[in-house]
Amino acid sequence: MSLTVPPALLEQAQQGAISEEDFLACVRTSLPYAWSVVAGTAEKLNANGGTVEINDDVPQNDKEWGQLFRMMASDSIRAAIERKFGVRLAFQNCCKVAAFAPDATAAYDEFTSMRAQVLNQRPELVDC
């Protein structure tokens, strides 16, 4: 399971639409490690006014790995976070999270290229 959904939010979803604010609160509570990585990366980008901010800290345990994988693999979670922070996210090498300014198309395209994926392989992360 990706998220620990409070009963009230589940009931709301069963009846219709939910607010993005409530959804993000559920994400933040359910995936605290992943939230801290992604939010921190996005906040640094926005504070610096640059085009890209990369966090390549390696998670310390399986729980942290799992949270990061679940967050970055979910289109709805990633899209909601992108809207909240006004960034575009990308993920590489099972732990490298990047936040891009919305207009940083060239940097995003390079980071998400096959070439960049090959160049960023690390032997210690083969089985991450």
What do the predicted segments below correspond to?
Residues 1-128:
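Fe(II)/2-oxoglutarate oxygenase catalytic core
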